[in-house]
C-alpha cells in the first residue's frame, strides 16, 4: 500500500489499489481507487470510483459519474454526472446540477443531498431510525417509511436533508 499519492493527468486514467492519502486530478481520465484513507479526486469529464473509504473523500466532476462503495465521510459535487453511494456510515454531502444522487443503503449519520434537476433516491437500512427534512419545488416526493416516533436508545439514526428543484425524491427501506 502507498502512504500518499499525488497524481495528475490530462487524459489518462488513474488506477490505485490501496492508498492512505490521495490527491488525484484528471481532465478527461477516470479515477479508480480500491481502498483510500483520506482523499481528494477531481475530473473534468472522467468518472470517479472508490471502493472502501476509511476516513473521508472529497470529489468533484464536471460531467463524470461518482460511485463510492462504502464510506464514512463523503463530500461530492457533480455538474451533470450521477453520484452513487452503495453504503453510508457517517456524513455525506452530495450536490448535483442535473445528475441523479442515489444512496443504496444509508445506515447512520447525516446525509445532505441537493440536486437542481436530478432525482434523489435514498434507501435506509432496516432498523435505522430516520429524521426526514425533504422538499422539492416541482418534482414528486415519496417516502415509503412508516412514522415510528422517537428513536430507541442505541438505535442507529440517520438525519436526511434532501432538496430538489425539479427532480423527484424517493426515500425507501434498503433492499
Please provide the spans of the model-predicted regions.
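Intrinsically disordered, low-complexity terminal regions
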Residues: 1-175
Amino acid at each position: 500500500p502507498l502512504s500518499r499519492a499525488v497524481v495528475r493527468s490530462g487524459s489518462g486514467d488513474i488506477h490505485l489499489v490501496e492508498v492512505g492519502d490521495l490527491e488525484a486530478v484528471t481532465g478527461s481520465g477516470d479515477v479508480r481507487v480500491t481502498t483510500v484513507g483520506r482523499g481528494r479526486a477531481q475530473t473534468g469529464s472522467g468518472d470517479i470510483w472508490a471502493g472502501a473509504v476509511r476516513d473521508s473523500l472529497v470529489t468533484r466532476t464536471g460531467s463524470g459519474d461518482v460511485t463510492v462503495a462504502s464510506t464514512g465521510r463523503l463530500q461530492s459535487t457533480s455538474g451533470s454526472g450521477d453520484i452513487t453511494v452503495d453504503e453510508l456510515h457517517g456524513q455525506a454531502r452530495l450536490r448535483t446540477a442535473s445528475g441523479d444522487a442515489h444512496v443504496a443503503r444509508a445506515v447512520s449519520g447525516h446525509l445532505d443531498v441537493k440536486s437542481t434537476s436530478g432525482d434523489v433516491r435514498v434507501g435506509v437500512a432496516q432498523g435505522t431510525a430516520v429524521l426526514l427534512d425533504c422538499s422539492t419545488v416541482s418534482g414528486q416526493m415519496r417516502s415509503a417509511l412508516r412514522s415510528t416516533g422517537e428513536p430507541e436508545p442505541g438505535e442507529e439514526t440517520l438525519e436526511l436533508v434532501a432538496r430538489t428543484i425539479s427532480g423527484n425524491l424517493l426515500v425507501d427501506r434498503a433492499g
